[in-house]
Amino acid sequence: MGSYKIAVLPGDGVGPEVVAESVKVLLALEKPFPKLRLLLSDHAVGAKCYQDTGTDLPDETLEACKTTDAVLFGSAGDPNIRFADGTEIAPQLTLRFVLDLYAGIRPIKRYPGVSPLLAADPPIDYVIMRENTEGLYASRGAGVRVGDEVAIDSMVITRKGTERIVRYAFELADQRDGAPRDGKKRVTCVDKANILKSQAFFREIYNS
């Protein structure tokens, strides 16, 4: 099965606690899979790192993320520690752009034996996929503010960015089982195409 390097970035807030438990789960995989070796290395990132060193994403951390097989990222940011322009520390956005992590994939599934949040207890199994590098994210660091009256961020939607996230969504849907209720495989486009030209462009590409 081989060895895999994982850069571990605990970060701020609940990050260290959540990552510590996640590491336990990952390392537990080595027992049932004796040929698997996970080589974990910890790296600094986040608001506390920025406060201590002047950077929220040290070069050493970035290089580690570029050369590993995976990155285990906790959380980053502190409302009391901000950049000079008032925005919060968000090294995860830098990683998105540098590593071109364009697909935000968030699976939602209800497992048997887990107390349901809904009284009806319906079967739940779907994935939310979001484009991670375009839209308003493309305006990060480039917005305009005029005194205390106006602030502007531009939304950017490109054909390349849209085509690849749409393609990824359909490929993922094809790999998964269908919806729990009827077994059908679906991809639903959620946008504001009825109002925004950029979103209408996104929908046009999706429909093509």
Residue ranges and their predicted role:
Residues 7-24, 28-33, 148-208:
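Glycine-rich phosphate/diphosphate-binding loop of Rossmann-like nucleotide-binding domains
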Residues 39-43, 106, 188:
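General small-molecule cofactor/ligand-binding pocket signal
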Residues 44-46, 132-133, 191-195:
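Glycine-rich beta-alpha junction loops
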Residues 35-59:
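N-terminal beta-loop-helix "entrance" segment that forms/cooperates
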Residues 50-155:
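N-terminal glycine-rich phosphate/adenylate-binding segment common to multiple enzyme folds
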Residues 9-11, 43-45, 73-76:
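Acidic/polar N-terminal loop/beta-strand segments that form early-domain functional surfaces
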Residues 2-6:
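Extreme N-terminal starter segment of soluble prokaryotic enzymes
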Residues 1, 33-35, 100, 121, ...:
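Short, well-ordered coil/turn elements that cap or connect secondary structure elements
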